[in-house]
């Protein structure tokens, strides 16, 4: 999610719909709109990436990632380019997805973001040096 990787000439809806089109999924536009609703962007569905803020682009990328209802979402620095408030909104979306059964594997260098996780694994020089279950989760 670091760079969003959205198609610049496609609307938010079209960007989210793309994986469904590759899979030839029926009702792809409806499913894509539901994913945008999930991340709070249904009203911005016709906007292109250059018309969206960084946080909105990030949410479009998340909607695209979850539109196929994956069991696991891999997120590399999903809040790295965002202000604290928007980063917390993104983490709230991930927390909600996780509470519904989606496994979220998230890479971050920010302890505040890591505090949202039930479990954190810290690495140094390619090795795990800390693996802990968090008793208090930020939400």
Which stretches of residues belong to each language-model region?
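ABC family nucleotide-binding domain
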Residues: 1-123
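H-loop (His-switch) and adjacent beta-strand-loop-beta switch element
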Residues: 120-133
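ABC ATPase nucleotide-binding domains
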Residues: 134-139
């Amino acid at each position: 999610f670091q760079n969003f990787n959205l198609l610049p000439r496609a609307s938010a809806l079209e960007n989210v719909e793309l994986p469904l089109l590759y899979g030839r999924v029926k009702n792809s536009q409806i499913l894509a709109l539901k994913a945008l609703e999930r991340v709070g962007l249904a009203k911005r569905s016709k906007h292109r990436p250059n018309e969206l803020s960084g946080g909105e682009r990030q949410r479009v990328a998340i909607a695209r990632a979850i539109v196929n209802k994956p069991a696991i979402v891999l997120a590399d620095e999903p809040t790295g380019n965002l202000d604290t408030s928007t980063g917390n909104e993104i983490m709230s979306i991930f927390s909600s997805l996780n509470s519904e059964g989606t496994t979220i594997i998230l890479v971050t260098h920010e302890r505040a973001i890591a505090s949202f996780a039930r479990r954190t694994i810290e690495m140094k020089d390619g090795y795990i040096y800390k693996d802990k279950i968090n008793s208090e989760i930020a939400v």
